[in-house]
Amino acid sequence: MKFKQHGKRPDWRALLAVWLTLAFLTAAGFAAYSAWQTSRIGFAVHFVDVGQGDGAIVVCDGKTLVIDGGTAENGAKMVEYLQNTLHVSRVDFVIGTHPHADHIGGLPDVIRACKVKKLYSPVDEFEAKPFETMKRAADDKKLKITVPQAGQSFSLGRAKVEFLAPLGIYDNVNDLSLVVRITYGQTAFLFTGDAERPSEYDMTDSGEDLSATVLKVGHHGSNTSTSYVFLRQVMPAYAIISCGKDNAYGHPHEEVL
């Protein structure tokens, strides 16, 4: 996981405490995370170290949202973090940003271990083992997959969770990624999954507010994402890149950094 700060600073009246556990941890297997907490009981975002993948947990006013869960090998880590670190057994919302193994592979374990209220995905059918495994886990719990539309939103306590993308039909599965903006007071987080430039350009043309205090950088810091025009609209104070140490893809790419 990489952490980077850019020019604009957050509203520290909202961000009262920030814990950052950065750098890649060794093979001991501990979950490195960054927890952003506002107020004593209000809002926190946890970026779980799932290596070359994405996994985040958002908690607000006793409500819990999981955004991606890393690969299947990281499912137990996500569950352990939920149950042992956060003491959560009920997950109100799960978002699988897109049907790739490094994003949804660990979600079946979350669905099996926790009582999940709602599951979001950009598709409800997809011919690939990670998605089929997630769907079976959901079916076993009588949990329906909901395919949201851009512009729809839901409340997570006092936080608002809004879907901004996908806005079109794309050949590249990465561009199908559900892009989510979470706002709590004056603080905003933008989660982009693996959305690449075509999706980013559609978002910048949409007129929607893309600004964010914290950007979860798209596609693990690949140069296929985080275009200049997109970054100029988001203007984050901080950026989180989730990727594995010495990964085969060379993420994060130098030009993104």
Feature-to-residue mapping (PLM):
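Non-globular, low-confidence helical/coil segments that flank catalytic cores
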Residues: K2-L257
